[in-house]
């Protein structure tokens, strides 16, 4: 029941900053941020990602400085995405399971130097395959589910053995969460968390990311519609989330983020589990480009966009704005 005007004047509570802050329903904090980074082989290597202004691929020695900044700012988690040399890419993505590969080495080094910083790794084959798909192909080019899951399981075990805190399967193969969870349990990795990319859509917003990890050229004109979700579907997202929770996921994710805030809200309302969203490369690139052209206020739209995730029900956000947002948040704390 609503009290009629003039007894009720909603603008009363909007009049002053103190009262606006007092009744604010949702707030963003540094604890909500996960910072995705792109890591290269070698030393002293830094490569700007042209389609993602302000984002760079970098070698481990330079990434250590970024990790230190994350710790200083209080960002809880860094998410690693590998840029794999073309000579290591094969149709079967075998490099993904190499215990001496790039990601296991980076994980072990980061955890040795920054034990309090949460480290998350991507469980997927597209950075490692010569065709740019997230799985193994049959003769017709169709992604084979079950044998792909076997490779993903080994990839997750390799990362867990290196000391990773969170494995995040982004592949969208059926049954992979259960297989990975059971394998982790069997090998004694009972504390390794799983953040499942549960509702990952076949979106046009991923373009800059594929440039960043170097899979765009391999993928070519192919798509991922046979395993990633149809953007027109909402109920299906709930079924996917339910399956992943039943199979042992500790946290679930919706990707992309801003175009799918309705899915975030439905997932949170339905399951009440830790729910995350990924503000993907295309979302980031749009806001950065508009700000660079003077069409939008950079900091204002950055913070408003992140707050929108919280209002929709997200417990946390993967965002390339994490460092900038954390600086804003800590400056006002």
Predicted regions and their residues:
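N-terminal amphipathic/basic leader segments beginning at the initiator methionine
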Residues: 1-24
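Alpha/beta enzyme core
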Residues: 2-4, 16, 29-34, 40-333
């Amino acid at each position: 029941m609503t009290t009629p005007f003039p007894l009720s004047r909603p603008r009363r509570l909007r009049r002053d900053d103190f009262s606006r802050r007092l009744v604010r329903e949702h707030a963003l904090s540094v604890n909500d941020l996960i910072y995705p980074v792109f890591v290269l082989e070698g030393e002293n290597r830094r490569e700007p990602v042209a389609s993602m202004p302000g984002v760079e691929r970098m070698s481990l020695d330079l990434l250590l400085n970024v990790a230190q900044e994350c710790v200083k700012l209080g960002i809880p988690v860094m998410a690693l995405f590998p840029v794999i040399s073309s000579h290591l890419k094969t149709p079967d993505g075998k490099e993904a399971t190499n215990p001496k590969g790039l990601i296991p080495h980076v994980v072990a080094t980061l955890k040795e130097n920054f034990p309090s910083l949460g480290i998350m790794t991507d469980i997927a084959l597209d950075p490692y395959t010569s065709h740019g798909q997230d799985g193994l192909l049959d003769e017709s080019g169709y992604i084979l589910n079950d044998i792909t899951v076997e490779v993903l399981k080994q990839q997750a075990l390799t990362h867990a053995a290196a000391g990773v805190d969170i494995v995040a399967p982004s592949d969208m193969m059926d049954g992979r969460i259960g297989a990975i969870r059971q394998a982790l349990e069997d090998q004694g990795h009972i504390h390794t968390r799983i953040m499942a990319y549960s509702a990952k859509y076949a979106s046009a917003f991923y373009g800059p990311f594929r440039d960043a990890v170097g899979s765009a050229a391999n993928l070519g004109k192919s798509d991922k519609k046979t395993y990633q979700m149809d953007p027109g579907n909402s109920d299906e997202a709930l079924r996917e989330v339910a399956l992943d929770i039943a199979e042992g996921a500790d946290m679930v994710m919706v990707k992309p983020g801003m175009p799918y805030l309705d899915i975030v809200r439905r997932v949170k309302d339905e399951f009440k589990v830790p729910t995350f969203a990924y503000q993907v490369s295309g979302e980031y690139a749009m806001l950065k480009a508009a700000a660079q052209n003077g069409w939008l206020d950079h900091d204002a739209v950055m913070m408003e966009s992140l707050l929108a995730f919280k209002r929709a029900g997200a417990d946390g956000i993967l965002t390339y704005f994490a460092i900038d947002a954390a600086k804003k948040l800590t400056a006002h704390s």
